[in-house]
Amino acid sequence: MNYNKKSIEDIDVKGKKVLVRCDFNVPLNEGKITDENRLVGALPTIKYLMEKGAKIILCSHMGKPKGEPKKELSLLPVAKRLSEMLNKEVIFADDDNVVGENAKKAVEDMKDGDVVLLQNTRYRKEETKNEEVFSKELASLADVFVNDAFGTAHRAHCSTVGVTNYLKEAACGYLIQKELKFLGNAVEKPERPFVAILGGAKVSDKINVINNLLDKVDTLIIGGGMGYTFLKAQGYTIGNSLVEEDKVEYSKEMIDKAKEKGVNLLLPIDNVVADKFDKDASPVITEDQNIGEGYMGLDIGPKTAKIYSDAIKSAKTVVWNGPMGVFEFKSFANGTIEVAKAMADSDAVTIIGGGDSAAAVNILGFGDKMTHISTGGGASLEFLEGKELPGIAALNDK
């Protein structure tokens, strides 16, 4: 895939109507935004376009309204908060059909530097099916398209891909540019040693990632729920731990592939276990890899955490996707904390692949110590799998 795409700095936007696909899919509680990270992430692109005298038309989805208007998934709270952040009124075009009379009038009345926000694109059933009719309507409002929503770059929807069929100029915003730079370099030309850490519950979610990364990394570290499937593949007992029986054979193949490729594959050598999945369960540390009857693994053990941390300390590039244990439960958060600490203390390029690991790093207060925290869980995974991301492929090449 070609990651060398035109950015907003490569196009003349003065006086032009610029449709910007943002990721404003933020959590709401009673109409209040509880996590503003995604809004903050969009500001550099919006501010640049304002300074350059563009007419800025923002669009995004929120949640899964499944093709019909749902008041609780309206982008009105986003328009209000953005107005405060930009010190400028963001006009909210509240049309249930997204491109309706309000949107058309708001866009018609725009002066250079003005900002309009359209209603939730997923109010339209055509959006997720990438149907022409809605793509055309969105494109009809603008002269130029800018995609700055990395979180949905792996989806071919009207607002990410379809509009590019009708707008000649299509470039990426600063957020996607940054994602492409860091993730692209990690996958294409990493500084070595290159260490990848994969956690989370399921091997099946990460099958292609494991396979692709074994061709690229020097060390692959595996923790989290998926570690138990690998332990079973090595012949250890895993008690009542999470396991994917149908992936045991695949895990054996990956262990063999790592040997073949000369990749240092690190798996747990001890575990923190409990007799139930509960935040108040008593943690027990195992002597070795084996987990006894009636117990389930809920975190990597201290010896494992030390080995993983040492591997991170000697790395020049580290990519992490997925926690090492049930970090929401205090007694089983230590593995994730140790990995995050080792990355925070490292002078390597450290990249967090969105989703749960990003949440963990931010909760632990290490966010500002990382080189880059990806804004897209699913998109960053597909990127690490080596897949082409439709929302990026559709933009103009440099």
From Swiss-Prot:
Substrate binds at D23, F24, N25, R38, H61, M62, G63, K64, R122, R155. ATP binds at K206, G297, E328, G354, G355, D356, S357. Its EC number is 2.7.2.3. It is found in: Cytoplasm. GO terms for cellular component: cytosol. Transmembrane segments: none annotated. One of its GO terms (molecular function) is phosphoglycerate kinase activity. It catalyses: (2R)-3-phosphoglycerate + ATP = (2R)-3-phospho-glyceroyl phosphate + ADP. Keywords: ATP-binding, Cytoplasm, Glycolysis, Kinase, Nucleotide-binding, Transferase. It comes from the Bacteria. Pathway: Carbohydrate degradation; glycolysis; pyruvate from D-glyceraldehyde 3-phosphate: step 2/5. InterPro entries: Phosphoglycerate_kinase (IPR001576), Phosphoglycerate_kinase_CS (IPR015911), Phosphoglycerate_kinase_N (IPR015824), Phosphoglycerate_kinase_sf (IPR036043). Belongs to the phosphoglycerate kinase family. PANTHER family: PHOSPHOGLYCERATE KINASE, PHOSPHOGLYCERATE KINASE 1, CHLOROPLASTIC-RELATED. This is Phosphoglycerate kinase. It comes from Clostridium botulinum (strain Hall / ATCC 3502 / NCTC 13319 / Type A).
